[in-house]
Amino acid sequence: MRKLAFLLLFAAALSAACRAGAASLQAAIDAASASGGGVVRLPEGRFLSDGIRLRDNVTLEIPEGSILVASTNLAAYAEQTESYLAPEGRKNCKAFICAENATNVAVVGKGVVVGNGCFFTVRCSVGGRPRLLRFIDCRDVRVEGVTLLAPASWTCHFMRCDGVAVRGVKIEAHSNYNSDGIDIDAKNVIVEDCDIDVEDDAICFKSDTADFTVENCEVRNCRLSSNSNFIKIGTASVGVFRNIDVHDCEVSCKTPSGLTDWRYYADGIPGVRSARTGLAGIALEMVDGGVMENVSVRNIVIGEGVQTPVFIRLGRRHEPSVEGRPSAMRNILVENVRATAPAASLIACSITGVPGLRPQNVVLRNVELSFPGEGKPPFPGGREVSALFGDVPEASREYPENRMFATILPAWGFYVRHVDGLAFENVRLHLANPDRRGDAVAADDVSGLTVRDCNFTPHIR
């Protein structure tokens, strides 16, 4: 509440002169680009601005002591081309700072950008809530050093861009729903040394264009906090994800959600005892007819407040897909992942396909995870342990999420089903308390299962 009150007072205190400066800021950007490029540097102070469009070869510098605040008038934001087709139809959304078909653009500095997200209607359609930064069809994009606060929707979105660098950025986003941290639908990307604390997904790779490949992307040395998923690929997955490496990151939930308390979501998520939790530490989700291949997530430390450390799903959310092809997932490596606290729910990790769609060549290596146990009846929400594998629904077309099966899974560590080529290598699974499910790992319809140097024996159907 203190943060919300501060934003309200902040907006009320801004002068009309600041609004007049918005036109001057856009004019300076336009003039710099027309003259071949340059740096447009804000002075120190607080500035309320309408939507800003970056142009070729322009760097917007927001120095320390400068605070740029987004207008709450959505009509003052530039329209962006409605140029892509997702399975559910065309999408469009405005952004406070945007660029489209631009080359060599940047937002840098030690200053602050405030999205005023709490002023936009909570839970209204995403089209009615602007993103904070959005780049479409751009080349050579940099976002460095800035602090991004209180977006109304996604914080930083790169769509069909080539050559993206995000370095040393701090993001805090708890003012509205769908407040992702960094959404990557781009190629040749580096994200490093960022601190992200958000309501929705912290780092999320998306593919909303069937003929564009999200590839050659690296995320490293970041600290991620989320009330949703922490490291995610999907759910939007109509194109190709290839050669993605996420490594040397820390994930934990630091901030209790003021919007979604998972203890009371639906009839309650089993075992969740705090408002300070997120869903999956690592979530890999292919459900829209795209392809995911050559993905590694490694050197990850999982701290407190993570409900499910690993969630991997291949499904049929949208079928037929945009291109009429089924989803595929292959060559996945999860390596050197260590939990420093037990999982924050009774929902086990899962690696699942559906009949006819099977993840291929998935390796978990040097993984040590801890689970809470306490799997004694009755479970929250009246749920019971599935007595038979067949009791776990396929949920082929359901939205992929750790809780999607609406049941306590038959194992307390990992439930795996419909997979070709799955290796557990030096995997250690621990219980903080006894669990009546008994088995650490349950495998159903898994071919090519190998278990080496692990502290469990899978229950195999």
Model regions: which residues?
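Extracellular/periplasmic carbohydrate-active domains that bind, remodel
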Residues: 17-461
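Bacterial N-terminal signal peptides
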Residues: 5-15
